[in-house]
Amino acid sequence: MVVTKIIIRCLFLLAILVSPLAQADAIDDIVERGTLRVGIAEFVPWAMPAKRGGHVGYDVDIGVKIARDMGVRAEFKVYEWKDIIPALEAGEVDMIAGGIVITPERALRITFTDPVALSGAGMATNTHMTREVENLQQLNDSDIVIATVTNTYSEGVARSIFDKAEIHSHSNKNDAETEILEGRAHAYISSLPAVQFLVANNSDAIDLPLSEPIVGWAEALAVQKGEQELLNFLDAWITAHKADRWLDATREYWFESRDWMQEVKR
């Protein structure tokens, strides 16, 4: 009995000693490696192929800034959206950049930082195919096809609000956008900024029936479960750069201007 108590006490003390070291592993690995591995997916204007190679966008600027503040360089790994959370869980990346929507379901698998920004779901419609549609309720019909991207929050919005419509989920935004542009879908639901840019670039064929989000949401960064030290650093980073308005200025550049369009590969 005495031996058992001694063993239990030793294990308890060992857990106390090891725990801080285990929590610091992610940051230690990043610093020792010299790179912060950032998971991104291609959505306008979060991450887009650049003319000079690599990617540009809001998420890219965030990843680069975080890495510089850590004294390392950013290494971007591009995934289809459905694969980005599994990549984080598998340890292929250290974090997911700022376009991921906070949901309770996702929080069971990954850990979110404090919110980086607020946004919401928007809808683009094919002008010719919806010329007789007068309200959103008319789009909730079995004859209506709505395009989305698999495993995005927007897909859930589409299936929830337009439960009678035929929902076509695509592995990437290019395929989803092509479907509405080619007249094979009546509407496309994605983040409001993404559909706004799609409409701006295709105003002869695509319309924006609503200027406000269908549903609002909060966006954050994400890390693996249990990486408390990295989470603490990122929360502090968000607080600091909200205070100095770097985050506001960066979001204004990517979401409210078009100055960056010359950087994007066509």
Question: What are the residue ranges of the model-derived segments?
Answer:
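N-terminal signal peptide c-region/cleavage motif recognized by signal peptidases
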Residues: 19-21
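Extracytoplasmic small-molecule ligand-binding "clamshell" domains
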Residues: 24-100, 108, 169
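A local structural motif
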Residues: 64-77, 143, 159-171, 184, ...
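Hydrophobic residues within well-ordered alpha-helices
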Residues: 66, 88-89, 139, 180-181, ...
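A ligand-binding cleft/hinge motif common to bilobed small-molecule-binding domains
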Residues: 83, 99-108, 157-160, 181-182, ...
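Periplasmic-binding protein-like
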Residues: 118-124, 192, 196-238, 257-266
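Flexible hinge/capping segments at coil-to-helix
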Residues: 126-144
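Ligand-binding clefts/hinges and TM-proximal coupling segments of bilobed small-molecule sensing domains
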Residues: 153-167, 208-210, 238-266
